[in-house]
């Protein structure tokens, strides 16, 4: 199976910058989006051969996720069942016969870390949600996790130590995810690869200089380890401040 995840930073804008070309070219089995920035009815995508599932934020022009899948899931749920987290359209879960697929747009801790405390609560509740799913079947989750885990996951670690996405607290929470029996698939295949990122600020010509962060991931239950085939980061694809990430898995 070929799985793709992309934070499109506004799907309507991304549609003007080649989204459908990439979508058709990749021919993924599951293609998920974060930060669609849409309300219901604002876009009608014609994607023959795919079932579409959308989760919208209550706030306009903000957040939002989607899953496009060739195989119809057994069931699809929205959110994680925790009231305070489920107003921003951040999570969709699709159940298949052998696994759960979850797409997630993790809350940003924000400048001055104004949302760090909320982010910590989110992390605890989201991990509990994943572990509950794992009691039934293995989990594959993908999305913008808004954290660069290690120093090799961003161009300028020293100057970002106290910035959102690279605080000790956020990195520690992702370490907890891995310690709980999950795999960062890109690092599984490329443990020491440097200079490969998935997000670049629109400011300071960051993409041109490759001053980026790897904050978009595919994470899987350890029980799926032997089925992993490859993980890719499509740095050549434009259209958003993020590029798409890919997981190839035999399942």
Tell me what each language-model feature is.
Residues 81-82, 107-123, 158-163:
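Surface-exposed cleft-lining segments at the edges of enzyme active sites
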Residues 1-47, 57, 62-63, 176:
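N-terminal, active-site-proximal structural segment of metallo-dependent hydrolase catalytic domains
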Residues 37, 42-109:
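Structured beta-strand-rich core segments of catalytic domains in phosphoester-bond hydrolases
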Residues 1-9, 98-110, 142:
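Active-site-proximal beta-strand elements of phosphoester/diester hydrolases
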Residues 60-75, 204-226:
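Conserved beta strand-loop-helix elements of the APE1-like EEP
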Residues 7, 23-41, 101, 130-151, ...:
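Active-site beta-strand/loop signature of hydrolases that rely on acidic residues for catalysis
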Residues 70, 94-97, 221-222, 247-251:
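Active-site beta-strand termini and strand-to-loop segments that position acidic
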Residues 51, 125-211, 215:
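Metal-dependent phosphoesterases centered on the DNase I-like endonuclease/exonuclease/phosphatase
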């Amino acid at each position: 199976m070929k799985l793709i995840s992309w934070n499109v930073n506004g799907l309507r804008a991304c549609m003007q910058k080649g989204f459908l070309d990439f979508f058709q070219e990749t021919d993924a089995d599951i293609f998920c989006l974060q930060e669609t920035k849409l309300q219901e009815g604002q876009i009608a995508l014609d994607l023959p051969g795919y079932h579409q599932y959308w989760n919208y934020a209550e706030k306009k022009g903000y957040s939002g996720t989607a899953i496009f899948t060739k195989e119809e899931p057994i069931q699809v749920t929205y959110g994680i069942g925790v009231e305070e987290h489920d107003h921003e359209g951040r999570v969709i879960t699709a159940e298949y016969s052998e696994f759960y697929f979850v797409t997630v747009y993790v809350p940003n801790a924000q400048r001055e870390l104004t949302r760090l405390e909320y982010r910590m609560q989110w992390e605890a509740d989201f991990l509990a949600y994943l572990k509950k799913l794992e009691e039934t079947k293995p989990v594959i989750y993908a999305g913008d996790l808004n954290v660069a885990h290690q120093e090799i996951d961003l161009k300028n670690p020293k100057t970002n130590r106290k910035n959102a996405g690279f605080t000790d607290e956020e990195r520690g929470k992702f370490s907890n995810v891995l310690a709980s029996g999950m795999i960062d698939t890109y690092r599984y295949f490329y443990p020491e690869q440097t200079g490969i990122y998935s997000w670049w600020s629109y400011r300071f010509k960051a993409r041109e200089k490759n001053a980026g962060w790897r904050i978009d991931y595919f994470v899987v239950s350890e029980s799926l380890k032997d089925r992993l085939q490859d993980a890719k980061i499509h740095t050549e694809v434009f259209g958003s401040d993020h590029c798409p990430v890919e997981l190839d898995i035999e399942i």
